[in-house]
């Protein structure tokens, strides 16, 4: 057979096979289309299906009953019916749970390596200054960290009300202006013997020498090196590694008023399993060992804060491993240098209070601005109620509160202010937001969860808000010790216009 006929034959066979394949694909697509039309209601396109297929759900703090979301077994729709939206809530039991969780992890880690020092948990007041937060936290035999002059007034108020005694550790961080120094000195002079001002700069020690009349404990903050991708090489806070030993010898060693008890170490990135973190921790420990050799009074290492909080339903962080590794490394380096292990202090703010908070909104309008962008407008502002969402692009767990049995769609969330930055358009696990489709006469509510840290202080609680958007109601939730039933109380009403326009 001529070669040309052979080529023609195989070409015709290929065309037939291609035609068959095309026909088969068309039949499959047609059948799938008919199937989808026939079984549309049975398809897994509901909001609850999306969540269950994307995450391991339900989770400890999130469950769904009758297509409505519960938070720590609290039916959120009941809160909304009682208090309305926008609404901030604080679930107090979570604060104690977090504190005791950290205590347990550090104590277990210490026991595993026969660590001789003690663990001391400090709460950072700047994370949330509210009295109900501080009172709940202090039930757990912990200590406090301050960052400004006004914090000292909080310490005095807690003492006057019997919440704390004078034996609690008060760790005073930050750059000290004259009023802060004066208040710290007054605290020490009044008998708060475990108040430890942490030296941030070399001139600070002279201010205490003038203001404090009693012997006192002090600490030194190390100016740690920043992460390589950060804008700066070295932290602006603290004293340089190379200057610490000489600073101790010239300013502290011969001054009988002061005892250097603590070396303070903090990494802005938080506690992470990275070469950068372990390298900085190792450098800190080497300085501690070198300083301990000439300063017998030194017996405490403050590793600051840095435990993250859950900001997604697929959040993953091995708290136990990191805790055990930190303690093991401290133990090993101290053993190699022949010195006793230090007492460990941590300063947890967000970890303490962050997961206790939630912020609830109503969807008040839907705006289809083009073929792709469908806006759900909330009844408040992200800039005023969750300022970290636009300030540092913080992502939170965001979930529908009701209508979990409805179909979902991709949306953008918009706030009420005129600011172009007042929006929320992505979650930590995906660059998109999905919520139930709206239906006439069926209100939609949404919640942002684990919002309990910093948002009120950064947003300016009680003050003027952007575009004069009022601060929302704030409700406190607790549980009865006898029957574990939850109860609520209104901490703050929605902000009045009188407070917004008040001038004097």
Where are these regions (language model features)?
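Cationic, low-complexity basic patches in intrinsically disordered or flexible, solvent-exposed regions
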Residues: 17-18, 29
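N-terminal capping/small domains of soluble enzymes
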Residues: 35, 39-179, 431-457
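Conserved, mostly hydrophobic/aromatic
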Residues: 95, 126, 148, 220, ...
């Amino acid at each position: 057979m001529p070669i040309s006929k052979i080529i023609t034959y195989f070409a015709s066979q290929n065309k037939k096979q291609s035609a068959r394949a095309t026909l088969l694909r068309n039949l499959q697509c047609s059948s799938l289309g008919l199937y989808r039309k026939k079984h549309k209601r049975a398809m897994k396109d509901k909001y609850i299906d999306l969540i269950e297929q994307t995450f391991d759900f339900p989770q400890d703090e999130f469950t769904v009953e009758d297509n409505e979301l519960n938070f720590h077994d609290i039916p959120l729709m009941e809160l909304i019916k009682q208090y309305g939206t926008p609404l901030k809530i604080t679930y107090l039991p979570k604060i104690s749970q977090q504190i005791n969780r950290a205590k347990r992890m550090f104590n277990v880690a210490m026991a595993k390596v026969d660590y001789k020092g003690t663990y001391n948990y400090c709460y950072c007041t700047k994370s949330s200054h509210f009295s109900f937060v501080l009172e709940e936290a202090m039930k757990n035999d912990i200590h406090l960290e301050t960052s400004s002059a006004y914090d000292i007034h909080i310490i005095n108020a807690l003492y006057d009300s019997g919440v704390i005694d004078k034996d609690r550790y008060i760790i005073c961080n930050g750059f000290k202006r004259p009023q802060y120094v004066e208040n710290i000195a007054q605290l020490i002079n009044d008998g708060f013997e475990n108040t430890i001002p942490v030296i941030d700069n070399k001139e600070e020690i002279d201010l205490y020498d003038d203001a404090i009349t009693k012997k006192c404990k002090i600490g030194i903050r190390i100016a740690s090196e920043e992460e390589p991708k950060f804008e700066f090489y070295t932290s602006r806070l603290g004293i340089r590694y190379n200057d610490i030993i000489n600073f101790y010898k010239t300013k502290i060693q011969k001054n009988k008023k002061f005892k250097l008890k603590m070396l303070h170490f903090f990494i802005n990135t938080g506690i992470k399993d990275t070469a950068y973190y372990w390298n900085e921790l190792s450098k800190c420990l080497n300085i501690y060992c070198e300083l301990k050799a000439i300063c017998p009074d030194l017996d405490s290492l403050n590793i600051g804060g840095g435990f993250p909080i859950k900001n997604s339903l697929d959040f993953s962080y091995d708290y136990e491993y990191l805790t055990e590794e930190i303690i093991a490394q401290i133990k090993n380096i101290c053993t190699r240098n022949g010195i006793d292990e230090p007492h460990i202090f941590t300063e947890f703010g967000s970890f303490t209070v962050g997961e206790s908070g939630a912020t609830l909104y109503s969807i008040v309008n839907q705006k289809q601005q083009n073929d792709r962008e469908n806006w759900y407008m909330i009844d408040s502002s992200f800039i005023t109620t969750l300022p970290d969402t636009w300030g540092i692009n913080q992502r939170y767990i965001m979930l529908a509160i009701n209508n979990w049995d409805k179909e979902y769609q991709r949306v953008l969330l918009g706030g009420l202010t005129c600011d172009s930055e007042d929006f929320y358009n992505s979650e930590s696990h995906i660059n998109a937001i999905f919520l139930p489709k709206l239906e006439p006469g069926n209100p939609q509510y949404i919640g942002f969860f684990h919002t309990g840290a910093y948002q009120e202080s950064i947003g300016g609680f009680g003050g003027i808000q952007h575009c004069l958007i009022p601060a929302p109601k704030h409700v406190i939730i607790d549980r009865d010790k006898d029957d574990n039933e939850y109860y609520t109380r209104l901490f703050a009403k929605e902000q009045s216009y009188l407070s917004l326009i008040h001038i004097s």
